[in-house]
């Protein structure tokens, strides 16, 4: 805070501000010393403004005098300026001392009062914090004596409003962050952007041209000041006396105002304290009442809570009584439980005993099972060994079978022919069988038909061996045949494709004993891969075979023949009474039954269980399990019955092989008793049938038991499912209830949240309103601070400019003195050189005379007769002879043809003054002489140009103009004349080679050093080179040489404030054709004019612009008759035909124009033969030019536009439109809107430039053209623009801006936080 206070005091006193003490963002309260010092701002500003006006007026006069006076008047003006400046500085120091003393006095008083009030507030806060616990202690608080508001008057002439600031209330204290360091930068950036936009617009052309006119006015004023200088000096003294009187009056007024302010502040301070006391009393009373109400509410709440607690105690007593009853019942129930538990314990002991007994039994059973498992494992090992042997045999058999399959495939086509033959063969077989039966009855041997299979197990009788044809048949299951029939394929399949089991070979014991054991050989198993291969082969064969409808009939007939054979065999065995025949028949039946069963199992497993290994039960395993079964006769009978049933079920048979007559006999054991007679086969068959029926009954009973168990299990499962379903229902109901409760709770919570949100929104709206008010007040305060800060900056800037001007004047004076001294020294050196040259000439003349005396005549020899001369005499004569020879040769052959380069002696004395000696031996001496000459000439030119450059720099910094002044041009012309005269005096004989070298070097250096354009090196070219270039090149700019330090002419439209700081200047020199009536410029020679012709700008010189008076304002674009080089603007002016009505009285324009006065000026006012120097001439100036390009066809450099100057404007501001028609009445014209008919529009627009647009946009909505012009006639049709949307019509009057465009426009204008109002 102290740093801010210091800065405010420094602002009052005009001292610089210490920004180092401030941070980037400093919190400033509106209750600080700003209020106390606000009144001093206005008074101080008014005084300082009056002083600065006077000082500026004097400074302008002094500057004008300094620029216009010649070297003789410089010293006088400097003395006067120094005296006036010293007086003004003394006055300012006195003012600053007075303000410092009184400001510190007020500051101390305000600080003391402020500290007292803060101490009182702290005491009251401490008392409040202590009294919050005890409500009764609030009565003891005493009110505080503090002030609430302080009113201060602004002494500004424009606004006499009262500024009120609320103090010492937390709600009213308004603090905001003021970026001290960045605000000024943003403000400057904003100004730069606005200036750039203004210069980019069309009417900036007029602004720049008007600035040139302003310079012309200044030049006229300078001429007037030169004439009236003596009168002004007398007036200045009178004005100084008046200023002193004014300052004395101001001092008295300040003292009086200071006393009044002190009295008023004391009164206001007392009033504020009283108002604060009243406010505090009101607050305390309100707070006490609010707390009493809260206390009463709390008491009521406590009473309600006590009533609730009383009811809860009653409920607790009732609960206790119920608990006592429950405790009694629980004791009784526990006693019953104890008795019941005793019983349960006894039962558990019994159960444990039973379990122990069962455990013993289980151990016995497990031991028996282990024994059985050991036996089984031994049997399995034996079987595995047998299986390995059988597998080997089967592999060999399979190879044979594959060969047979190929043969069968070839014979399938002959099946139709063989079917007929088979019928005949069957009849023959029947006849043969009948014959054989007759023979058997006679001879009593029995013929046993043997089944020839791949695993041919053959049995033979003991008595005889009979060769008979045996047909081997196989039966296929109905499932497989049905599949084949559905596909239309009922084909014979070879039986060799199926895996067959090796039948067990029975061993016959003694005749008295029965068949006891049947030793099993092995069972075969096949892998999945083999089954898959076999199955695929079978199906392929079936697919390849043709469909024959006769196969079915053939297979049916074969089945019938098999049945007949079986029945015939059974009848034969019953009729025969011999033991051997019955035994053989039983064996045959067993073998056939086993073979058929094996075939059925193999077919079913191969076709149905294709992916599983086949495990076929053998007759041996069945016989081991049933070791105590009846005899073989009974088994044979039962097997024959089973075979008949299967044959009756399966109606399809397939012939697998041809009948074979080969039989392998086997010899039976010879130890068979012929006396043993087996039982009859009928009894065995009957027993078998009984056993089968019993087995079927047992099976049915077991199936019923299983079915009952399944039904019971199903019933249990259904019951369990119903229970589960009921439980699920209960759970679902509970979940639904919970969900409903949660939903209700959520609804309540949402309602609460909505209410809270509404409350928050209301609070937020209140806060926003309060924040807006605070922001507006803060913005007002910021603007006021910024305005005052700007004023202080302007004052500081003016002071700095004034100091700079003084320093520049002193520097210019010092430089001029130095230049005078240097010139004097140069003149002395020249005189010395001339003296030396004269001495050298005299010596040369003496040498010539001595040569004539030394040279011998043709009659006398050149030598003397005496040979005894001294050495000194010989050397002297030798040197004299050399000089004599060189002079004679130069005289005879000429200077250019002589072997030694030497200046000519035939010139006059004026030419000999500038010549220099050259030695004849070294070529370096020639170069050194040339270099010395060039250095001397260049030094003279640079010294003269430095004088001009210093003056030009001073003029540009003071006035901010790009062009050269009139005095500078006159000085340049005079200096150039002096240089040219000095150059004419000098004449030296140069060699042709050296001239060419110098010419080329100058051209190269000028082209290479083109981009260097510092003002220090703005030296004109030597006169010799400029003449040579002008002779070789044309006068156009494209063919002109590029001169070091001279930039091409810059266009007017490219002018900007930043161009003042540029180092390059555009040379605007006059041409030969433009005749100027100026005595100072007429002194230029023809050589100077040839140099000026190289300028291709073809425009006007600064001298022409300065000397021309303000012409009449004529809006026309005709041909310029003043000079032939000025071109005509072919296109009409864009401002004349533009639809925009320029308001020239706005902030961007310079002055207002009268459209009526323009019509008064006629074209006949100006004669064709007038010159630009005349005051009433409408001269033209260049508007635009291209860059430094060498294009000869550039036309833009030749386009020029007339200057439109403003006539004397009316101060009323009634007619502000310059490009309007003459006969329009603005008050009655329907096309002019109402807001444009106001007479005070000019003043309002001028005041509008000081307003911040952000504030205006936030308060007022945007205005669109359809609101101003809602309807318009378009070809007889009225169009309503209020309904028109944005179109790409390229007509700005029909399009409406979007939000993005508004934001981008405001950002480009420099406002960082644009506010966009809703267009609705």
From Swiss-Prot:
Transmembrane stretches, start-end: none
Coiled-coil parts of chain: 221-444, 683-855
Composition bias type Polar residues, residue spans: 653-668, 851-863, 1062-1071, 1120-1136, 1175-1187, 1199-1209
Knockout consequences: Null cells divide much more slowly than wild type, have a high percentage of mutant cells, become multinucleate and have very enlarged nuclei.
Composition-biased stretches (Acidic residues): 908-926, 934-951, 1155-1170
Biased composition (Low complexity): 54-75, 429-447, 615-640, 669-679, 864-877, 965-977, 1026-1040, 1047-1061, 1072-1096, 1143-1154, 1188-1198
Complex and partners: Interacts with aurK.
Family recorded in the similarity comment: Belongs to the INCENP family.
Protein name, UniProt field: Inner centromere protein A
Native organism: Dictyostelium discoideum (Social amoeba)
Gene responsible for this protein: icpA
